[in-house]
């Protein structure tokens, strides 16, 4: 993705990217969102792939939400840096509607400039 973005951007062009912080995917979403009294525990390895987990019978996907896939921070950030983009800003945000936000940020956004 970043190779193509870099290819079409002119020198000095900006690319803003937002993505989920990968650690969020390590927890069972049902416990995070619907069972606040249950203990949190690590359940899934990264990178997260809900389609594979469904095929293995480990989770059931609600068709209303679709499949989710995560990428490692290295894939996201290094992918930008190794494709002619320089990071000029970085932002994290929390979704206060669930308890994981007490431990870290849910969302990450980067702003890069084409070199």
Per-region residue spans from a language model:
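Short glycine-/acidic-enriched loop or helix-start segments at secondary-structure transitions
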Residues: 1, 26-28, 99
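A short glycine-rich, Lys/Arg-flanked "PGG" loop and its adjoining helix->strand segment in the class I
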Residues: 1-14
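Basic side chains
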Residues: 7-10, 71, 114
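Glycine-rich loops and low-complexity Gly/Arg-rich segments
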Residues: 14, 40-44, 111-115
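A short hydrophobic/small-residue beta-strand
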Residues: 15-16, 87
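SAM-dependent methyltransferase
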Residues: 17-78
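C-terminal lobe and adjacent flexible extensions of AdoMet/dcAdoMet transferase-like proteins
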Residues: 75-115
